[in-house]
A protein has these predicted regions:
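Long, low-complexity intrinsically disordered regions
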Residues: 1-211, 216-217, 223-296
């Protein structure tokens, strides 16, 4: 949701404002696995057309829905439930299939229905968009496997394997504690360089790319098996507390109260850094100061 996107930006970009996610350089869409993404406008095709089904049936469904939606809207914007009714859909969420054409944008603020509208088709082929999506995934999540890419993107294992095969000459095989995987050859130098300085504390929102991992990859980020279910819960995930670049706990917010659950005893300096991060979160509509409550 946009608030999570805003906090992800805040964790990485200085002077993030409550309205930063609404910048004209950004767009909202139903992206990989039909989840809501906020991405750079120039990357719209990558995160939409890159997930277009390879099979004829899936492709027809996406393209037919997109064409019908474009016709119904006629250049206007509409709540997605109303658009679903206008198309005779028994479930308006089926509109998400149309997003894989790269012609559907949305505005969703979390509490209300999403507003949908259509835009011209991207000037890029589905294949090129898919391969760039795989490159982006490898750059952020690598070392990675075709299987993990297929899970994350929702395109399935066969299509993911095909994408990695197409990129084979630009990939480098690596061995990790959880198995063999791949990185971009262009990232090999970065992977071998010792990490630079990191922020003392960061609060990452639910679903942040830093810990949006599946399967055994989670073991690399949180080695303690007893702690992993606390971060990757069966329902809505909490946020992750980063201290000196390592996940050291979880956090949730209710109104103006941020509750931090630390996994280990932390220093007073680290505690102060976490509290400073929490009180500086650029939360839209929050008028009172943030209060931090600790659970240890």
């Amino acid at each position: 949701m946009p608030r999570a996107a805003l906090l992800s930006i805040n964790a990485r970009v200085a002077e993030t404002k409550p309205a930063s996610w609404e910048d004209q350089s950004l767009v909202q869409l139903w992206g990989p696995r039909f989840n809501v993404y906020v991405v750079a406008r120039r990357d719209l095709a990558i995160f939409s057309l890159g997930t277009l089904p390879d099979d004829a049936k899936g492709m027809r469904r996406a393209e037919d829905l997109a064409a019908r939606l474009h016709s119904v809207l006629g250049g206007t914007r509409m709540r997605h439930e109303e658009a679903g009714d206008a198309l005779g859909l028994h479930n308006a969420n089926l509109l998400r299939y149309a997003a894989a054409t790269g012609t559907v944008l949305i505005r969703w603020e979390g509490a209300k229905q999403a507003t949908v509208w259509t835009v011209p088709p991207p000037a890029v082929s589905p294949r090129d968009a898919r391969l760039e999506l795989a490159r982006r995934y490898l750059h952020v999540y690598g070392p990675a496997t075709p299987e993990s890419f297929g899970q994350w993107s929702g395109i399935g294992p066969r299509s993911a394997v095909a994408a990695f095969e197409a990129l084979r000459e630009s990939l480098t095989p690596v061995r990790t504690p959880v198995g063999d995987a791949w990185i971009l050859a262009s990232d090999e130098t970065i992977a071998l360089v010792a990490p630079g300085p990191v922020a003392r504390a960061r609060l990452l929102p639910s679903g942040d790319a830093f810990f949006l991992l599946q399967g055994t990859d989670r073991e690399l980020l949180v080695p303690d098996a007893a702690r992993r279910p606390e971060l990757w819960t069966p329902r809505v995930w909490p946020g992750a507390v980063l201290i000196d670049g390592e996940i050291s706990g979880t956090w949730r917010r209710a109104g103006t109260t941020v509750t931090v659950q630390s996994w280990d005893r932390i220093s007073s300096a680290a505690r102060e850094a976490v509290e400073a991060e929490a009180t500086a979160l650029p939360l839209p509509g929050v008028r009172r100061p943030i209060v931090v409550r600790w659970e240890e």
